[in-house]
């Protein structure tokens, strides 16, 4: 039932309007009166259903019966049917407008509507204060509502009633009521109120009694008037003359014991007055009168005086025994009453009462120490002794309420059967019904308590606050936290000093994400009641629920040991254990595992027999689990569940240890078993906490494996059931962050911070999300809020370091990491947290030891592979649940004044949960991980982008996903080292050798480089300077024409050197018969002689001799007339172009027929040579002779160069820039460098962009340039200028990447070329252990060059430049390090298939003249026989498909703390060459802290290599 539903009845009770009745407008018949009483009875019993039936019967007799209309309207209001209640009021006002029933209903409806109809807040406060008995406050609020005016008629009555209760307002109240009576003399409400007020003071009490006696005879207000009449008689300081007043009351109520006793006292006074005085008798009389007046000290004094005179006087013994009874000194009472009863039987009942109450007292003591069985036995014995005494039944009901609400209700009902107004029974039922949701019945019973009994049991405020508190629990069960908060706040107003109400409210604030409000509620309690054990206990409970074990311990330590209950003692011991666990975790975090285990071992010893307590045993087992000693934790935890049927409590304890030990498989099974059990609400709360923590851990594990979808599926039931759960919302935010949705993640963190603005974990997480969006300003704002709260927190300081590191501010990150280490050291230096010395238990704590600055440098104790994230291993939300106490949410049944309200009824766990199944454990802690630890997975994406270069096209190196950096056992120290490794100054030097196969002087390459590198931290970045002496050598170019013609100026230069070396080809040509014919000079004797010799050789001349009868002269004459000789005699052939001669001769059959065998072919060869055809025979001979004369037959064309490269590089976070030159001293020198940026999109995606100008190092020509000594021409020194974009996605298990590149290649006297490249790859992390990592994948590379410039002639670049290239490779990366972590290595291997094709390309793409000369020279070379056949001076097209492979291995050894020796070997056949490379280097780190073996060998690479 809602608080507002009961408010009108509280108000009516305060006004006592429920007791008012005006004169009836009609006479009731006896049947009607019987039905009215029956309806009221059922209403008082909380059975509104039966009351409604009765009142409806009344309306069947009389449709306007006022009591029936009022009763049904009250039920309507209680059940929220306000409109129905108003209809009944209209009917009542129409039939009986002046009746008390109508007035009462108007007040009830008005009070109810006030909460929603804008009632004056002063009036509302006045009524609330009056109902709580705070009359001074109520009067002030009324007067504020009246604004200085007289009270209005509708409020005057309630105002004067409140005013009468104030110390100075009684007279004004009396006078005001008299004025009301004079203005409305027939109003029974005013008459009753005035009579009551008169009875409050002794001078007017008899007048009030007379008026109340008269009013008691009325049918309408008789009941309340009689109650007030009785109370006034008990208050009256009566004399013998007042006996008739008591006789008049007893005439109507003869069985009233107290009034009868009061009359007996008056009669005794009369007897005493007429009997001679007996001193002892007088003393006895005075003693009994004092006892009757509850003046126990006076009574004790009188009875003691009598016993001094008559030691065995039964009356004195009985009287003093009665005093001891009232003093609750029941054992002494028995000793006194036993002889009294023996002397006078009338004291037997008192003796039994003493025994009875002593047994109940002993039962309460047993219950307080937790011995419920003994308590039950004692209570049952007491009930058997006095079965009609209700207190025993109430005590039994209190004991049963926690586990058997049905039996408890029966016990309370038995008590009420013996005393219908018994406060304990009524209060017990109120609490029981409230917890069962029967709030209407609880409220009805609450209203039944008379004022005197309410005062006896603690007052109306206590009872009302208990109902409000129980109603708050009901609202919480229904998910209505707002109404629950309203009820608890109202309860706190009623009883501001009640520690348990404040604790309930503080818990509600805590759950609502308002820890500051929760703390304020408890601080308000401690400010007033800071020395009360209950207040300190409640404060300790809130502290432990918040994870503040230090605060819990300190609160409990302020309670004197003698005042601690068993629950307090147990909680204090548990808090101490948890503090030891925290210290152990700090030691483990610093890599001091041995010290942590020693600390807990001493804790075991110190606890001794206390480990028989399951709560302490579970706490200690959890501490071992936190320290990483899972085996010891499980051994201890097994003791909780030994036996055939472990208790639910012990199984919950066991589950909490499994949670802390990360034994998820077994934990899942235990939780499923518990789901089918019946638990108390407190046990169910803890079960739900364990279940949620387990589920959230699986969510995080799935997230860190990259299975975001599965993680959300596991999380969604928790979000649905607990939408306000901070840990569930934080898990959802982490899912968004993992998906790269940092904006959404930050929005969730902001929602959490609206409710919990001081939540450190959320503040640091929000800072990370803001930093991930490059919003450093917001990130810093969150960090400053966190640091303002916890400036010495190592976690917060480390989080700040991580944020600044991610933002590239390494210097600032280093400062925070150093501060975090210092904070850790301060904490570790106080291992006992100040708990040692005189406190016993904490004396076992080990003393702290300063942080070892050399920790981890030469190898730390091996640690188990991390199964879950650092957050899960260290605690946070999961361990908060696991370490939460299991018996310290103080059940209200243990709290004085609230015992009956708070009784917990058992609940079935399965009934309280949805049908959603628990997620399966993602991985068991006992199975070695074959996957990377989550922290490594996130780190692995950094630096994972494959390098892209126009000159380095080997398969993408997926090996960048390397092992995590060497661990020291302290994550903060590791991160500081990582930052220092980036910031530290360093020197490195080494030698690199690279060899490519190829032709000497052309494609062959031997490259030796000796880089010396120095790096210095500058601001937030790092500046590097490199000097690289370099030697390149391609060997000596061969002098044979076939080789020499493919270098420099090509065939033209090559043919001269070939002829100079050997003139035979010239002589052979010039001396050939056909060439001699062509060298004739017309009709000369020399010509005729050459013709004769030629004809003689061909046989023509012999034929002419025969024809001319062997006449030589005739034959010579005839020869001159032959076609060919006649043609040659007719022209000067030596000065005629060979081409023209060839056309004339070969084009005339008559002429060509006279050529000798083979001479026609020779002539055709001459004519086919472009160089020869255009020259005359004389000119060609001269040309050839000149070539031979100008050539150098012994020329050696060595291709080598030396120089020193210089370079400067700056890096700051993701930004990098470099500027340098190719080696100075090379023939061609170029400025090179680049600007790049590397960024991240979430935790799984990284990207980079670079604009660069790089040297192309494929050959001596492309790298250093070349000069053709034959022609003096220089060319080469190629650079590749362009843009590259890369992206990598890696979820820790699978990854993929894509690279795009576009470059223009340019060189001195080299044709420009454009290059485009695309790389795509996919890989899987196949193995990830503490010391090894194995990654395998597939890579596809495609690229194109516009031109084929792979040649070495003038205008070519000497670099591989296919027009199409495709490589499909299957790379594997294996990296690792030794167990001692002094040597690391990485091996990369790939095998695949490559295909490329090149188009034909002229020897001289930039110079047509040279190209033409090359054609001429090539034809002459063929003509002269320098080559087997003529070949065009063009590089032929090519298409090739084959196997590609790549094998690379690197290792690094830490030979000294700051000195590293490393090397690498590489073999590959990628592209169109085979290559081998090796290097050896030394690396020295200036900063000792930053000198740690990295996650992979830091190979000193060539500044000109693509990987640089």
From Swiss-Prot:
**Record-linked InterPro entries:** BCSC_C (IPR008410), Cell_synth_C (IPR003921), TPR-like_helical_dom_sf (IPR011990), TPR_rpt (IPR019734)
Q: Name one GO cellular component term.
A: outer membrane
Give the pathway annotation: Glycan metabolism; bacterial cellulose biosynthesis
Instruction: Print the keywords alphabetically.
Output: Cellulose biosynthesis, Repeat, Signal, TPR repeat
Q: Which GO terms describe its biological process?
A: cellulose biosynthetic process; UDP-alpha-D-glucose metabolic process
For this UniProt entry, which residues form the secretion signal? 1-27
Any single Pfam family the record assigns to this protein? BCSC_C
UniProt repeat feature TPR, residue ranges? 32-65, 119-152, 314-347, 354-389, 391-422, 423-456, 499-532, 692-725, 726-759, 761-793, 794-827
Q: Which domain of life is it from?
A: Bacteria
Entry-linked SUPFAM superfamilies: TPR-like
Task performed by this protein: Required for maximal bacterial cellulose synthesis.
The family this protein is said to belong to? Belongs to the AcsC/BcsC family.
Protein known as: Cellulose synthase operon protein C
Q: Which organism is it from?
A: Xanthomonas axonopodis pv. citri (strain 306)
Gene name linked to the record: bcsC
